[in-house]
Amino acid sequence: MRQLKREVKIGNVTIGGKNPIAVQTMLNVPVEDIEGNVAQAKRCEAAGCQILRVTCPSAADAKCIEAVKNAVNIPIVADIHFDYKAALACADVGVDKIRINPGNIGDDDRVKAVVDACQQKNIPIRIGVNGGSLEKHILAKYGAPVPEAMVESALYHVRLLEKFDFNNIVISIKNSNVPRMMEAYRQLSAVTDYPLHVGVTEAGTYQMGLLKSGMGIGGMLLEGIGDTIRVSLAADPEKEVEAGYNILRAVGFPVAGPEVITCPTCGRTQYPCTEIANEVERRLQGCKKSIKVAVMGCVVNGPGEAREADIGIAGGKSEAVLFVHGEPVRKLTGENILDQFMEEIYKL
């Protein structure tokens, strides 16, 4: 059962409570390239991104935040480190959320300046704890970025904001070690009702990043923990969005768009099952229907598994049995089984 947290409004998206899990990504174009950032932001929006983060190293870079915000219709988050004036500048241009670690932007007066700016414009702050950049005194206490150290860091930063009567807060507590990350989120969720941004940081190359994020993010969602997610990949941010939705779909959350399932095939397969499944998935890109499509390799397990889908085929030599809503309908034969199958899918 999902652990319900307080609601936080980020632009036109609300997270927490019973609201859907929001999928995020972050632009990776150099901040000086405003045109490139705008173009990438539009691609992310088209891919289904619901919350978009953009780095802002200095106050002067707020012009990139402003340009991106004016170009898309999804909330923009400014990623701030060290320079509190960058946070103030982003608040001035109407950013929808600010991600900081209050402990690394200076003394209490600077933290209060950021809090006051966000308070005046109802801008939430995400406290983004990372296992690779914990405070020295916390690392000295625990010796490593163990879950307890990460939770202590997060709560330390929360108290800094709460000291100034600010509670429009989201928290993340990321680590590249999946078991540590998961235990940290468990411990944090048990002691706070602020909504949680879930992710695995520095997850590695594309393939390993997918695996670690699937395990870490998916595992947390299955335990009811998480209000928004970001899949960190060494890839284009659109791929992160796609992966985020696939994780949500895999753990049972309703996601607009088709899900294509297929068997791994074996020596019994007598038709190009894998090629057909890949082509079906390609042709259905952009489809918003929430349907499950099965492409199965043979008549052993295929019919039973295809029956679990909205529509599916179980193949044999030069033919495939078509199933619709669990019932066998007819055989598809000839050289154009794929085209026949797509016609049936489009009828749903």
Segments predicted by a language model, with ranges:
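Glycine-enriched alpha-helix->loop->beta-strand junction motifs that scaffold or abut catalytic
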Residues: 71-74, 92-98, 119-122, 189-195, ...
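Hydrophobic or amphipathic alpha-helical targeting/insertion segments
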Residues: 85-126
